[in-house]
UniProtKB/Swiss-Prot annotation:
Protein name: 7-methyl-GTP pyrophosphatase
Keywords, in A-Z order: Cytoplasm, Hydrolase, Nucleotide metabolism
Species for this entry: Pseudomonas syringae pv. syringae (strain B728a)
Family recorded in the similarity comment: Belongs to the Maf family. YceF subfamily.
Keyword Cytoplasm (UniProt): yes
Catalytic reaction list: N(7)-methyl-GTP + H2O = N(7)-methyl-GMP + diphosphate + H(+)
Record has Cell membrane as a keyword: no
GO molecular function, one term: nucleoside triphosphate diphosphatase activity
Length: 192
């Protein structure tokens, strides 16, 4: 079996991949993650997932390289990582009582064959009505400034949800394991 490499520095993705109990290593790809003019969010996450995986092929022959990227979409607007309290407050205020769709791009690149499987897995979060005090308490408690949509679904962020909708809850955290297992099996990897 080719070695498995996660093209990410995300601790969330690393923790998710570890659930599969397969040996893997991690390496952070160096790519330009800028959105192209008029690029649809669906296309953006698939392109970035593929580029992250392909960026590591030169140094990693005979590897299956996993790339992933995620954006949150609210009212057809892409929400990036807030990086600050103020921006997170704006995002969660705008999302209050609405639905936020997370698009997670996933790529599995076989550096031996040059073949790449790419997909996008959507997951929708229906948010509760949130007042400013609730949002501020949440932000001070969890500081989700490195998360698209300004919350951590694997933590206290779940308290902001009214309901969720999607085929793979792990896609919300950044690595859709159900779809990844399909891709790995197609490459001949035994899971479990």
């Amino acid at each position: 079996m080719p070695s498995l490499l996660l093209a990410s520095s995300s601790s969330y993705r690393r923790e998710l991949l570890a659930r599969l109990r397969l040996p893997f290593t991690c390496r952070s790809p160096d790519i330009d993650e800028s959105r192209r003019p008029d690029e649809a969010a669906f296309d953006l996450v698939q392109r970035l997932a593929r580029e992250k995986a392909e960026a590591l092929t030169a140094e990693h022959h005979h590897h299956l390289i996993i790339g992933s990227d995620q954006v949150a979409v609210l009212d057809e607007q892409v929400l990036g990582k807030p990086h600050s309290f103020e921006r997170a407050l704006e995002q969660l205020t705008a999302a209050s009582g609405k639905s936020v769709t997370f698009l997670t791009g996933l790529a599995l690149f076989n550096s031996s064959t040059g073949e790449c499987q790419v997909d996008c897995v959507p997951f929708t979060v229906h948010m509760r009505e949130l007042d400013r005090a609730s949002i501020e308490r949440y932000l001070h408690a969890e500081q989700p400034y490195d998360c698209a949509g300004s919350f951590k679904a694997e933590g206290l962020g779940v308290s902001l949800f009214r309901s969720t909708e999607g085929s793979d809850a792990t896609s919300l955290i950044g690595l859709p394991l159900i779809r990844l297992v399909d891709m790995l099996i197609k490459e001949g990897v035994s899971v479990p």
